[in-house]
Amino acid sequence: MNKILVIVSFVFISFLSCTGLTDRQRLANQILSDTNLLKVDSMARATIRSGFNAGSGYSQIWARDMNTFIEVACEESDPHELREAILLFFALQQPNDEMIDGYVLKEDFTWYDDTPYYSDVAPKHVAFKNTVETDQESSLIHIVGKYIRKTGDRGILDEVVAGKTVLERMNLMVDYLMRERYNKEYGLLYGAMTADWGDVQPNDDFGCDMNDLSDPAIDVYDNAMFVIALDYLLEMAPDSSQAPRWRSLREGIAKNVRTHLWDEKRQKFIPHIYPEESPIPEGFDELAIHYHGGTAIAIEAGLLSKAEIRTVNARMLENVRLSGMPSIGLTLYPVYPDGFFRGGMSKPYVYQNGGDWTWFGGRMIQQLVVNGMVEEAYAEICPMIERVIKNDGFYEWYGKGGIPSGSGNFKGSAGVLSKAIVLLRDWAEKNKG
């Protein structure tokens, strides 16, 4: 009889213990018990161990891509090879101080590009740059900042490449942006008109080089990336003689983003300011478009309040519902009209014109966790996790109906998901019942 009482008492106490868990503890336990998260993280790390190129179908090493898997690469790749891959970017920095998009061995330079980049100190490689964008310099600064955070290798800042240290070269990249891509009227960086963070412009068959067909445009993505880059410079070299300038630039860019690009009434960023002519066809309201990727980077840059983050996230979810796309990786909504871009992007919900990219959706998940919105982050990452398992790979982007497209093992997608999973599980470990 006493044994029965003891057992019943134990069960009752256990029941009270389980039901006494807080919502936070239940969520933490659910995250920690989700084997799909562990599976996808393992898959991501295996993908990134295969090299520093952007993914299957890409022979090139891109700065904007490496920026999103560098932290995982620091844990999974050969440290010397990773360091050398980073330094090679600086070897290919151009005489005008601009940074390239990426590089490849000369024998693998097999595509059409009428403006290849070369350097005497990197004789085996050829570089390339989609000049419609203005994120290359910022992306490489992010890479170095993240690399130092993960490895503690501050010596890379003093590494001399072609007569200048890495830190000096990064400061020269800031000089280049302020000299060549800074609009004085608005106090912001500009590039050519593209779809949010994209690197393809309309009105041009090739679409990747700034030229006479380009429409200069100011957007939140380029400027948020620059704000983050300046934060990294201040973190890496707080005692530099350039630190006061970096701090002043950071404050000015952040203020001007809020002044000129934030639409207070609609609680969203406007897509573009056009200092010259607008390419938008009559009758189409570009101001109604929500740029999901640029917004995620703006959150990372600290440009939105917690209340605003909740608002834009709710809007992203509504845009996903209205569009019928799979996840908040949806690049933008509403999409640009049929035929506005050329080639494949001329159709809505294709590639950067409304395709669904884990590469940016995963970064939004990261920011939700960082800003304490873990329940939302976990719910919103699930469609991305499920499609990796279903399709056995990290596809570059997804079209209508969740159809996988582009590179089948896109390392940017793998990197952002792995980091998001680590953030979720770290939070869960601290809050479990």
Regions found by a protein language model. Give the residues of each.
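Bacterial Sec-dependent signal peptides at the C-terminal "C-region" and cleavage site
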Residues: 1, 12-25
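Alpha-helical support elements that line or immediately flank enzyme active sites
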Residues: 65-96, 294-306, 362-374, 381-384
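Alpha-helical positions within canonical tetratricopeptide repeat
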Residues: 81, 169, 242-245, 249, ...
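Catalytic cores of carbohydrate-active enzymes
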Residues: 23-45, 61-62, 99-105, 178-191, ...
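Long, repeat-rich segments with strong aromatic
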Residues: 252-257, 302-313, 319, 323-327, ...
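Helix-terminus loop motifs that line ligand-binding clefts
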Residues: 77-159, 164-191, 324-344, 380-412
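Solvent-exposed loop and edge beta-strand segments that line ligand/cofactor-binding
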Residues: 49-67, 74-76, 122-135, 208-224, ...
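Short glycine/serine- and small hydrophobic-enriched flexible loop segments
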Residues: 71-75, 142-152, 228-235, 300, ...
